[in-house]
Regions:
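Residues that scaffold, gate, or flank divalent-cation-dependent active/transport sites
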Residues: 1-109, 113, 238
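DNA-contacting surface of Y-family translesion DNA polymerases
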Residues: 10, 202-365
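Acidic, metal-coordinating catalytic segment for phosphate/diphosphate chemistry
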Residues: 20, 326-442
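Short acidic, glycine/serine/threonine-rich loops at helix termini
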Residues: 20-23, 46-49, 156-164, 228, ...
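Short Gly/Ser/Thr- and Asp/Glu-enriched loop/turn motifs at secondary-structure junctions
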Residues: 107-111, 151-154, 294-298, 363-367
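Long, highly charged, low-complexity intrinsically disordered interaction regions
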Residues: 129-188
Length: 442
């Protein structure tokens, strides 16, 4: 097989969180009616996953609890994020019995890409046969069902998974460039395709483009004018082309130099209560910098205010989540430090100053983000020292932070708490019991 003749698998664990909860209860993930959602939250809470049996009844993934028809009997499982991470790691271990880690890209907790090109002769099978073998092994060891897409590049493997396998009785999909054009050039909607969201679909529609076939045949100049360099990706994907390969992914190093913490508050917070949360978040970001051996050149805060019913209705009328986020009234600011720092005192003081200077005192608050910018390694060369800083005091504070980080790493994030964490409006203790904003289950 030539270096240009590749075979990729894209494997997705079906309704992963819901499947894990079914297996934990000794139930069949494919036939059990189950949703993963926190019953302690309101009926507006989002279902993190719904089982295939619920999907068959028309219940869409990521719906809100109140949207589930009342005549459907189902199990509501409280999220257990730590368990899902553990099961995902178990399944990754199954993958490693077939492929080396350099040939696996973990796309998300429930989805991976695999370059199986060099393994087909080793195992004496086709890409589909290897995919079937891996999928059957995962099911046998963990009880979790999976779908699989196969293609000669990462994009076609992903589309084979997302579109073709979804409509296949055996949950397998396989595409090459020719079958992609033959079967999917007229497929609608465009949002079914990887990397095309509602916003891009609307912009393409204004250009008279509603299918991948129309996109492939469209003149390129207007596309580049509208989308800039991203037009190249759209055009390539319209033709089923993807130049990025597994080795490119493995060689990629992020150029991001920031560290952030954000949260959506469970209720509308007044100015004083939100300041408490901002202080907690400042403490958390400072400790994360120490844990990672990093320094920040700046710190910033963004506050999103609560939206009125009228504002939400106007955003929905404009259409799309992007329009909704654009409509959120907000404020914030940034402070640069004399030299990069991870001092808890400096970061805490800066956040309080920014909050007091920039945040409206009369408008309820619902969202907050604290971001450390210009992040560098502690030992990086060329760092300009702050000649006016008290070095001995900073060293003492740094040692305390390292000790706190060590205790939390061993005994959990709630092992060391400050007085502010015990205030009724504080969110830190609850967030410490969460993974990705949802209950960890531990």
């Amino acid at each position: 097989m030539s270096t240009d003749d590749r075979q990729y698998l894209c494997i997705d664990l079906k309704s992963f969180y819901a499947s894990v909860e079914c297996v934990e209860r000794g139930l069949d993930p494919m036939t059990t009616r189950l949703v993963v959602a926190d019953p302690e939250r309101s009926d507006k809470t989002i279902c993190l996953a719904v089982s295939p049996a619920m999907k068959a009844l028309g219940v869409r993934n990521r719906c809100r609890v109140f949207e589930i028809p009342p005549d459907i009997d189902y199990i509501m499982a409280t999220p257990r994020m730590a368990l899902y991470v553990e099961r995902s790691a178990d399944i990754y271990g199954v993958y490693l019995t077939y492929l080396a880690p350099e040939d696996i890209h973990v796309y998300s907790i429930d989805e991976v890409f695999m370059d199986v090109t060099d393994y087909l002769s080793l195992y004496g099978c086709t890409a589909r046969e290897l995919g079937e073998r891996i999928r059957a092994d995962v099911l046998a060891r963990t009880g979790i069902p999976a779908s699989c897409g196969i293609g000669p590049n990462l994009y076609l493997a992903k589309i084979a998974l997302d579109i073709t396998a979804k409509h296949s009785p055996d949950f397998f999909g396989e595409l090459d460039e020719e079958s992609y054009k033959a079967t999917l050039w007229n497929h609608r909607p465009l949002t079914d395709f990887w990397r095309i969201g509602e916003g891009i679909q609307r912009r393409l529609a204004l250009m008279g483009i509603h299918t991948m076939g129309e996109l492939a045949m469209a003149p390129e100049e207007p596309l580049y004018k509208e989308f800039g360099i991203d037009a190249e990706i759209l055009i390539d994907h319209a033709w089923g082309i993807e130049p990025v390969r597994m080795e490119h992914i493995k060689a990629y190093r992020s150029e991001s130099h920031s560290l952030s913490s954000g949260q959506v508050l469970m209720r509308d917070y007044n100015y004083s209560d939100a300041l408490t949360v901002a202080k907690e978040m400042a403490d958390g970001v400072a400790l994360d910098l120490v844990r990672q051996g990093k320094l920040a050149a700046s710190i910033s805060i963004w506050v999103g205010y609560a939206m009125t019913a009228e504002m939400r209705a106007a955003a929905r009328e404009e259409g799309g989540m992007r329009a909704w986020y654009r409509s959120i009234p907000s404020s914030g600011g940034t402070k640069r430090f004399p030299s990069p720092t991870n001092s808890r005192e400096a970061i805490y003081r800066a956040i309080v100053e920014l909050f007091e200077a920039d945040v409206d005192r009369d408008t309820p608050i619902r969202r907050m983000t604290v971001n450390a910018g210009g992040v560098v390694d502690e030992g990086a060369s060329g760092i300009q020292l702050d000649l006016f800083a008290d070095g001995e005091r900073l060293d003492s504070e740094h040692r305390r932070q390292e000790a706190v980080a060590a205790v939390k790493a061993r005994f959990g994030n709630n092992a060391v708490l400050k007085g502010i964490d015990l205030l009724p409006e504080a969110t830190g203790r609850e967030r410490n019991r969460q993974i990705g904003g949802h209950k960890s289950g531990v």
